[in-house]
Amino acid sequence: MGYEKFTWVIKNFSSLQSEYIKSDIFVIGGCKWCLLAYPNGKQNASYLSLYLDGPTLKTLPCGCRRRIRFRLTVVNQLSENLSRRGEGKRWFDKKLPLCGYEEVLLLTKLNAKHGGFLVNNEVKIVAEVDVLEVIGKLDVSKESQEVIKPRKRMRLYGDGGAVSSHLHKETSSVDVNGFQVLPSQAESVKRIFERHPYMALEFRAKNQQLRASCINVLLSLIKTLCQSLQDISIDDLGQTEQVLTFLQNSGFKVDWLERKLEEVKEKKIQEHIGKSRMQGLEEDLKVFKKKCSDIEALLEKEKEELKGLKQKCSDIEALLEKEKGKVLAAAARTPLTFDDIL
């Protein structure tokens, strides 16, 4: 059967007041499911908790069980490589109707301003479920499920602001230059071959799955190079070089992509050098500002001492003038006569 996907967008995440919120119920493999999220953690308030729940299992007779594979992903909307995913395989039954992760993502990372998990105050969660075995009756018959699948279902929770998008799974493919690609990829692949028509002339693989995998690798590489310099590391670029080598060894002529990679690498290196210089200059500025502050403080102290010395000079000058007046007064007195002395 393979995985089927359900996307849940939680709106107004930072203002949620409820202890937990639930998505709409969705149907995969004839079984009803929903997602359960604790915005402030179930046990640890530092983490987002996320669970997959089988809401009807509690009401089904004992012995009813579903064995599934599942993936729960908190999507990084800036870089898919940074998304946080957990996956597992297990039985769901009346006693164990839900499974998930108590600490799926640290809230400081989720709430980071440019972290990519919280965009426009929205958190995007994707559940992928593959029902492997069902013991007991289905919640929804296959016929009913076929009717339900194409319909979009969207509902706002009045107090939580959670929006559940429709169930979807891309199973069809489109041929572009001999490569089977998903409809969502067709336009991008078509543009690549329009700009570089001889890119795959030496690519000899006949297996369509292998051919599709190589195209996926190519698209992922281009997507990586389209990220902002802030979102891509030098290590990422090193891995990108390895991917490029893989494509070249597979027969793809991607010298144009190699040039772009070198351009991005050069810009990233310049950014790294610039940041190092900035850090050094910031440290120098900090030191010189401290010296200026110390000298200014010393100058203020010297000013106070100078002010005191000037005051002392003024006091001494006044005292000198006073003594000088006494001396002049004494000198101007009429001399005593002989008779005055006798």
From Swiss-Prot:
<keyword id="KW-0175">Coiled coil</keyword>
<dbReference type="InterPro" id="IPR002083">
    <property type="entry name" value="MATH/TRAF_dom"/>
</dbReference>
<dbReference type="InterPro" id="IPR050804">
    <property type="entry name" value="MATH-CC_domain_protein"/>
</dbReference>
<feature type="coiled-coil region">
    <location>
        <begin position="253"/>
        <end position="327"/>
    </location>
</feature>
<protein>
    <recommendedName>
        <fullName>MATH domain and coiled-coil domain-containing protein At3g44800</fullName>
    </recommendedName>
</protein>
<dbReference type="InterPro" id="IPR008974">
    <property type="entry name" value="TRAF-like"/>
</dbReference>
<feature type="domain" description="MATH">
    <location>
        <begin position="3"/>
        <end position="129"/>
    </location>
</feature>
<dbReference type="Pfam" id="PF22486">
    <property type="entry name" value="MATH_2"/>
</dbReference>
